[in-house]
């Protein structure tokens, strides 16, 4: 039994004449260039050291916006500067720096004891309370709750310095001169002065960047920050 030739012939796929092979090469080149450009902007091909360095630089730049320059201008802030800084900060919020500050604060105050977990949870709770207060007292501002948590977390940087001085540096000086009663009194006075300065710094920063000007807006924030400052002083 024989079959016709057309029964065993497989026709080739039809290729449109207006789709030249060179076009496919151009598309491939474009795709490759796009992938190369996106890969150069990614973080998968960089080392851990480069990633940490980039994160530290970004945290430092946000500290300049939130904390560094605003302490002298607390009593006479500029509305234009506040608006520009607020828009930039609320648009680029992160929780890496607040997490790092809370970990450092808890380590300094607890001395890596079992108190660390309580301080860690309490610090996040304080940040949440501050963020909720800002969100409720400023309903007209288009700032999310996460942004307020991030801003409040950056304002904990002076409290980290307070914990470092009160719990690490001053105790070392105390052990060196503990035989002299005057040195002990001076160190206690220095601890209170450092606590007051860092508390004013934190309150000034969070008030400036969130445009909080009335007592109703500032007092709860100052009370939360005072609790953290007092814990790092007495523990």
Curated annotation (Swiss-Prot):
It comes from Saccharomyces cerevisiae (strain ATCC 204508 / S288c) (Baker's yeast). It is a multi-pass membrane protein. InterPro entries: Yip1/4-like. The keyword Membrane applies. Signal peptide: none annotated. May be involved in proper membrane localization of Rab GTPases. The chain crosses the membrane at residues 89-109, 114-134, 145-165, 186-206, 215-235. This is Protein YIP4. It comes from the Eukaryota. Interacts with TVP18, TVP23, YIP1 and YIP5. Interacts with SEC4, YPT1, YPT6, YPT7, YPT10, YPT11, YPT31, YPT32 and YPT52; These proteins are all Rab GTPases.
């Amino acid at each position: 039994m024989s079959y016709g030739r057309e029964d065993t012939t497989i026709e080739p796929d039809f290729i449109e004449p207006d789709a030249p092979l060179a076009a496919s090469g151009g598309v491939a080149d474009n795709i490759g260039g796009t992938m190369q450009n996106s890969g150069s902007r990614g973080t998968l091909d960089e080392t851990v050291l480069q990633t940490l360095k980039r994160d530290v630089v970004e945290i430092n730049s946000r500290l300049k916006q939130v904390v560094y320059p605003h302490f002298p201008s607390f009593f006479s802030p500029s509305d234009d500067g506040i608006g520009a800084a607020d828009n930039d900060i609320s648009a680029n919020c992160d929780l890496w720096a607040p997490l790092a500050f809370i970990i450092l604060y808890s380590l300094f105050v607890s001395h890596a004891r079992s108190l660390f977990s309580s301080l860690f949870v309490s610090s996040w709770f304080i940040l949440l309370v501050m963020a909720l207060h800002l969100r409720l007292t400023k309903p007209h501002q288009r700032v999310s709750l996460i942004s307020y948590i991030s801003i409040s977390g950056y304002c904990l940087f002076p409290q980290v310095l307070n914990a470092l001085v009160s719990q690490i540096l001053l105790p070392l000086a105390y052990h060196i001169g503990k035989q002299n009663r005057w040195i002990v009194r001076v160190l206690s006075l220095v601890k209170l002065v450092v606590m007051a300065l860092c508390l004013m710094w934190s309150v000034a920063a969070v008030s400036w960047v969130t445009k909080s000007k009335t007592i109703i807006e500032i007092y709860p924030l100052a009370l939360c920050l005072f609790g953290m400052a007092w814990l790092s002083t007495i523990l």
